[in-house]
Swiss-Prot record:
It is an enzyme of class 3 (hydrolase). Exhibits ester hydrolase activity with a strong preference for long-chain alkyl ester substrates and high selectivity against a variety of short, branched, and substituted esters. Is able to hydrolyze ester bonds within a wide range of p-nitrophenyl derivatives (C2-C14) in vitro, with a strong preference toward substrates of >8 carbons. The keyword Electron transport does not apply. Gene3D superfamilies: alpha/beta hydrolase. It catalyses: a carboxylic ester + H2O = an alcohol + a carboxylate + H(+). It comes from Xenopus tropicalis (Western clawed frog). Keywords: Hydrolase, Serine esterase. This is Esterase OVCA2. It comes from the Eukaryota.
Length: 230
């Protein structure tokens, strides 16, 4: 039975946030991994997940190449740092990669078919892609309309193909979530990405490579999101 609204009462707006998963994850696994965060944000923001376009052929990649504890059913990624082996390592410098056309088209399709969105969130490789999307938005790319970005365990892509996206300071309002004991994406790697944003909000937590959602972090999430609810 539907709830009855009080006459004249203003309905509270809930932010819609497009969420990009990490390497070797997918829509379903990231939905499960963000369960605690979605609970903390209930009534303020809804997360909408979707899968990256590239299938990862080898789920047993070398340590440090991807995100641990992911469901292996349809492991996916946004791009490969080594196109010949269809693999990705955030610490691998590469002159070429699998390209951004497919992932950007996938995200643009999500904006078109699932949007509109108030913000965009990314985890690990997804956060690296979010940073690039922020740069494209700033340059006037008409496919991406949003007001803020949340980057969890983000890093700067080491592919020379992506270097152009870091040439100008990124002015999109951003919250960067960094794990002090993250052994997959070190805090130093995340801080390097932060340096490319103007006036970033930084949330440090004592944990590792995951999306934190305990009470202390909730306060920071809320304060950041509330700026866009007015």
């Amino acid at each position: 039975m539907a709830a009855t609204e009080t006459p004249g009462a203003a309905q509270k707006r809930v932010l819609r946030v497009l969420a990009l998963h990490g390497y070797r994850q997918n829509e379903r696994s990231f939905w499960e991994r963000t369960g605690a965060l979605r609970k903390r944000l209930r009534g303020r923001a809804d997360l909408i997940t979707f899968s990256a376009p590239l299938l990862v052929p080898d789920p047993d990649a070398e340590p440090g190449a991807g995100d641990p504890d992911s469901l292996q059913d349809e492991s996916r990624g946004w791009w490969f740092s080594n196109p010949e082996q269809n693999s990705f390592d955030a610490m691998e410098e590469s002159k070429t990669c699998s390209g951004l056309e497919a992932p950007l088209d996938t995200v643009a399709k999500a904006f078109s078919e699932l949007g509109p969105f108030d913000g965009i969130l990314g985890f690990s490789q997804g956060a690296a892609l979010v940073a690039i999307i922020c740069a494209l938005k700033q340059q006037g790319d008409p496919r991406f309309h949003f007001d803020f970005a949340i980057l969890v365990a983000g890093f700067k892509s080491l592919s020379t193909d992506h270097a152009k996206h870091y040439q100008q300071p990124i002015t999109v309002p951003s919250l960067h979530v960094i794990g002090e004991t993250d052994r997959v994406i070190s805090a130093a790697m995340s801080q390097e990405l932060v340096s490319h944003f103007e006036n970033p909000v930084i949330l440090m937590h004592s944990g590792g490579h995951y999306v934190p959602a305990c009470a202390p972090q909730k306060k920071v999430y809320w304060e950041f999101l509330d700026k866009f609810l007015t």
